[in-house]
Amino acid sequence: MPVVKVKENEPFDVALRRFKRSCEKAGVLSEVRRREHYEKPTSERKRKKAAAVKRHAKKLSRDNARRTRLY
């Protein structure tokens, strides 16, 4: 859990914003959402593999688009 120390004369809103940002960087909310329901190991592998395929296809399409514009 991220810890944020409130500095002297620092408004509460600023400290809260820093805390939210540190939670986002640490991935606390995504971890909570991921652990909310049990996911079987096979479905987890399947989901991760599908995400990797999607990332790879997106990267290839970006590279191809970049090459076609360089004439």
From Swiss-Prot:
Entry's family note: Belongs to the bacterial ribosomal protein bS21 family.
Single GO molecular function: structural constituent of ribosome
Name of the gene this protein is made from: rpsU
Pfam families: Ribosomal_S21
Domain of life: Bacteria
Skewed-composition ranges (Basic residues): 45-59
GO biological process: translation
InterPro entries, per the entry: Ribosomal_bS21 (IPR001911), Ribosomal_bS21_CS (IPR018278), Ribosomal_bS21_sf (IPR038380)
Segments of skewed composition (Basic and acidic residues): 34-44, 60-71
Keywords associated with the record: Ribonucleoprotein, Ribosomal protein
Protein name (Swiss-Prot/TrEMBL): Small ribosomal subunit protein bS21
One of the record's GO cellular component terms: ribosome
Chain positions covered by the region annotation Disordered: 34-71
